[in-house]
Amino acid sequence: MIARTKIICTIGPATNTPEMLEKLLDAGMNVARLNFSHGTHESHGRTIAILKELREKRQVPLAIMLDTKGPEIRLGQVESPIKVKPGDRLTLTSKEILGSKEAGVTLYPSCVFPFVRERAPVLIDDGYIQAVVVNAQEHLIEIEFQNSGEIKSNKSLSIKDIDVALPFMTEKDITDLKFGVEQELDLIAASFVRCNEDIDSMRKVLENFGRPNMPIIAKIENHLGVQNFQEIAKASDGIMIARGDLGIELSIVEVPALQKFMARVSRETGRFCITATQMLESMIRNPLPTRAEVSDVANAIHDGTSAVMLSGETASGTYPIEAVKTMRSIIQETEKSFDYQAFFQLNDKNSALKVSPYLEAIGASGIQIAEKASAKAIIVYTQTGGSPMFLSKYRPYLPIIAVTPNRNVYYRLAVEWGVYPMLTSESNRTVWRHQACVYGVEKGILSNYDKILVFSRGAGMQDTNNLTLTTVNDVLSPSLE
């Protein structure tokens, strides 16, 4: 059974071996996420090499995503996890040290120290550990813990009521982007996006490195990102709803409504949407998810999210393969009750938000024709990815087989809802149609006498303007004679 909603897996110590990565792929991984808040270029380079070798061997459109560290406040390295309980105190310093309970822990960036005030609430590791500032100095602050937990290396930290303007891109981010371009990665996830100018500035950096069209995913993690969301959505290629930091920056009870709002606007503006953070969190330690987690994933799918993301579950968890299999099972079961018609009507109704009226008119008409004719799939030839992306926006029941000669587009489409990318070296319509039908049969999407709708370009045209209703048998029959 196919799964239209895509799965993103964060790669970490639990899964960065060839054997585990292949198991993740078999379980349902569509995108491999590399979190550049952790690791080095050397360690990420090794993982990238394994992923590229794997996707080449298996001939699959596995995308590789670089997730930037961004302008975040984060702890430094600790010698070993520091166990804390209510009333315990810990020193945070601007000095570069290997952290311990006695020596303290480094806090990055150092520019935040002058802005910290006593009695300010502190949240560590997505809010799991809570503390309060009891002493604030120019290069040192002391916090007192309000609950028990473990302080680990590189964990995120949020200080309430702090008014410091951090730069959107750090020197590390720029170095990481250069590395990502050199490694020919497929997607960039930009952390802590606050406005559309942030996206524009990152595009200029990527252009300077020779990759102006590299897709940028805007991670919405703070109140400014929410406030400027519609402009950010238009400026970016996709959206990630980063619920962890969002639930810290804003009230946690606001997150569900914001998730639905952002998923809807992303879809209406033709941008893919990723729902992330704590989706199957308990599976870091347990082989089965909670009922609430299953409902959370299902609700994200019913919201129309393009992809769901696993973080600690696959990066450092005890049951990474089980987590991906569970996610795929939830997707397949939920999509049985997905209201495809309602999503089509909703997207078709919001004509004011259409980015390309021409493409969308062709796409919407084609979907209606295909469904009325009881077709089993849509086949579309694309050089830029535009046509399948606009088709995906309407959330059709029919799988979209996207045929492309562009390797960058092939991998980039891996994150799009309901799109099954196929790489070809052919531009001849007869040949690529034949290849697409063979691919569809091999993947279990099509059978011999199924009807299909083919989108293609007319002679001299740059955009899709031809719709052909045919059958798999008619396309394949020349080779059977």
From Swiss-Prot:
First-level EC class: transferase
GO molecular function terms attached to this record: ATP binding; kinase activity; magnesium ion binding; potassium ion binding; pyruvate kinase activity
Pfam families membership: PK, PK_C
Superkingdom to which the source organism belongs: Bacteria
Transmembrane segments annotated in the record for this chain: none
Reactions catalysed according to its record: pyruvate + ATP = phosphoenolpyruvate + ADP + H(+)
Pathway: Carbohydrate degradation; glycolysis; pyruvate from D-glyceraldehyde 3-phosphate: step 5/5
Record carries keyword Magnesium: yes
Site location (Transition state stabilizer): K219
Binding site for ATP: N35, F36, S37, H38, R74, K155
Protein name per Swiss-Prot or TrEMBL: Pyruvate kinase
Annotated source species: Chlamydia muridarum (strain MoPn / Nigg)
Organism lineage: Bacteria, Pseudomonadati, Chlamydiota, Chlamydiia, Chlamydiales
